[in-house]
Amino acid sequence: MGNYSTKIDEKWQKKWEENSLYKFNNKNLDKKLYVLEMFSYPSGSKLHAGHWFNYGPVDSWARFKRMQGYNVFQPMGFDAFGLPAENYAIKTGIHPKDSTFKNIETMETQLKAMGAMFNWENEVITCSPDYYKWTQWLFLKLYEKGLAYKKKAPVNWCPSCNTVLANEQVLDGKCERCDSNVDKKNLEQWFLKITDYADELLEKLDELDWPEKTKAMQKHWIGKSVGAEVTFNVADSDLSFNVFTTRVDTLFGVTYVVLAPENDLVDKLTTPENKAEVESYKTQAKNQSDIERQSITREKTGVFSGSYAINPINGKKVPIWIGDYVLNTYGTGCVMAVPAHDERDFAFATKYNLPIERVIEGGDSLPYTEYGGMVNSGEFDGLLGNEAKEAVISKLESMNLGRKKINYRLRDWLVSRQRYWGAPIPIIYCEKCGTVEVPIEQLPVELPYNVEFSPDGKSPLGKCDDFINTTCPKCGGPAKREADTLDTFVCSSWYYLRYPDNNNEKDAFNPELINKMLPVDKYVGGPEHACMHLLYARFITKALRDMGYLNFDEPFLSLTHQGLILGPDGLKMSKSKGNTISPDDYIKEFGADVFRMYLMFGFDYTEGGAWSDDAIKSIGKFVDRVERILENAREEIKNSKDNKSTMDKDEKELNYVRHHSIKSITEDIDKMQFNTSIARLMEFTNALSKYLGIDAIKNALFLRESIIDFITLLAPFAPHFAEEQWKLIGINSSIFNEKWPEFDPKALIKDEVEIAVQVNGKIRAKINISTSSSEDEIKESALNNEDIKNSIGDKEIKKVIVIKNRLVNIVAK
């Protein structure tokens, strides 16, 4: 074992803190670099290996950038509201505030033991009143701009968590947190109008340096569709309904229409003889989640309402069906069915023996879903694609039965939660004045401590008289506070704006400072947030820009998703499986730098992989070996009597590896390819060891320059160990104030190269030649090689082909 241990970690962490080494200078923003990892949720009592995989390597990247001359801002905080702490409190009796702050204290200690450059003076904790005061301010600003509103709506309800879930929090019909089946309820809820920004959220995506998969997920979630809205009248009635379609050119092929079970028209147009069956079907549909109902693999079901609609383009009667695959929250809650040209409609029509009529030519069989000439479509026969669509829409417009329309899959953001542990919504209800905003000067509306929060389906704050009963700020009369709390994603939708100005008591942030500090230059976190946090943060940034607070469009310019660290068994880590990895145990045994380097060398950063104890031991041995080599190098420099100043063959060989390492590591670490960066360091280590092992006079000055570069390259990956080695070579300033080395292109031009020599296409030898050798000299060296002579034997040499500095091929027969 070498001398490196947690004692060295603690020594340098103390020095860094005493010297305020990493304190951010917000007065010098010319080369600022805002580096941000998604903050952690303090639901568990400790950080696990997955947290480390997010934070450790990114800190190494930030250190590298600091050494390149950037003024790095790397804050840290905690996303501290939410269900897990409340559920833990219900289970254990420990108040969410108490457990959350205890966990935060533990995690802060762990994060500091990592030795990262976190700017702790800029810490934010979302459950602190001095933070959620400004979350409430944000809500009020959105309300003032008409971007926050309340309405009764069908919502996803988790009967176990006893709260509303956003669509994004329902996975395959189950709650993402507790795996319970999700129900539907009609409740008065608060929403944010993210749909107002649907177009811009799409348009700006391609400009971002984000993973293509994440951008594709957001595009799909927003789901822009350009088409037409068509009006169908109900036969023998004054009722009508609209449908949205992207294929209005298939309108002549409509043979039935389908309404969502929740559609208000269902009760009005269902005939008495069909009522019982329809009611039964509605009950069945109510127990399905939106995502489950939209599943591609699920068989589509429906019931006939007994009524008919009139196809506006040809006047034909078509049956009106009720089907749960139609969502009342998407489009108009009604769809037209063209079974000849839609796979879903074809399957439904086949199942229920409904007519199938071709109106687009092409394909040998049905359904045919591509574009083609219109057929069986009267005056429109022969028209294609956009021309066909335009003609049909024009006809519908002339009849006042249709128009062009753009539709979105994206729904407004539901932010009400019927739970305790969240930011109270700053709204008051007065019988005289109606809905009233809490005045800014009365913020924060503080979350009371003594509340009965056992879940019963109602908002816990509604049962707290001291909280719920208040005075109307307008008329001074008795009033009630809003009992719901805000979705935790509201808290995290703007936290990146608070970090640089976290002690501001007058405003959420100083726009002058924030507009210089942001956008975030590098954001790192898991891909699971693609359609929630990342989308919400983009929306909030744009909304605040339009209010005049921000002068930029996007919060995060560059985004990287780290991979997933699995248990030793290759499965996702969980306490129930007993395969979790505690960083603390390994740090105690190996030190923080070995743990950090293992995470960066053992896994591709964006892929992750399974944990291996053997692999971390190998990294520990590597650090010990580096320590021995650097000690030998110091001794060589110190005791060198017959020093030389020339750069001979051995020096040139080491110098080549040195500058190749500088070039490769600089390129790879910049792209967060940490594993290949450390592989280059290992090659550099081998080259140093080889040079130290030669029995010849050495160039001590060159050796010192080489180990200075080596330690500098090592520093981002093993910060404590590198600081210690830096001091041992006699330099008193921090290595993190050192300039990152630059490679010398001349050092990468070799005097000699190794080339392969083939006989009849098979490699028979390798020879070293001067890079300045002529073609004749290369031929001569190849033909004089003993292995080549033996391979040729008595054969006659017919041809010698030379590819300079790469290959010699001898043809002999």
Swiss-Prot record:
Q: Which InterPro entries match?
A: aa-tRNA-synth_Ia, Leu-tRNA-ligase, Leu_tRNA-synth_edit, M/V/L/I-tRNA-synth_anticd-bd, Methionyl/Leucyl_tRNA_Synth, Rossmann-like_a/b/a_fold, tRNAsynth_Ia_anticodon-bd, Val/Leu/Ile-tRNA-synth_edit
Sequence positions that bind ATP? 575
Q: Which SUPFAM superfamilies does UniProt cross-reference here?
A: Anticodon-binding domain of a subclass of class I aminoacyl-tRNA synthetases, Nucleotidylyl transferase, ValRS/IleRS/LeuRS editing domain
Q: Where is this motif: 'HIGH' region?
A: 40-51
- Locate the motif 'KMSKS' region: 572-576
> Recorded E.C. number(s)?
6.1.1.4
GO CC terms, sorted: cytosol
Keywords, comma-separated and alphabetical: Aminoacyl-tRNA synthetase, ATP-binding, Cytoplasm, Ligase, Nucleotide-binding, Protein biosynthesis
GO biological process, any: leucyl-tRNA aminoacylation
Q: Which reaction does it catalyse?
A: tRNA(Leu) + L-leucine + ATP = L-leucyl-tRNA(Leu) + AMP + diphosphate
Q: What is its main location?
A: cytoplasm
Write out the GO MF terms.
aminoacyl-tRNA deacylase activity; ATP binding; leucine-tRNA ligase activity
Q: What is its subcellular localisation?
A: Cytoplasm
Keyword Aminoacyl-tRNA synthetase on entry? yes
Alphabetized HAMAP family for the sequence: Leu_tRNA_synth_B
> What family does the entry list?
Belongs to the class-I aminoacyl-tRNA synthetase family.
Q: Which NCBIfam families match?
A: leuS_bact
Q: What is this protein called?
A: Leucine--tRNA ligase
Point out the gene that encodes the protein: leuS
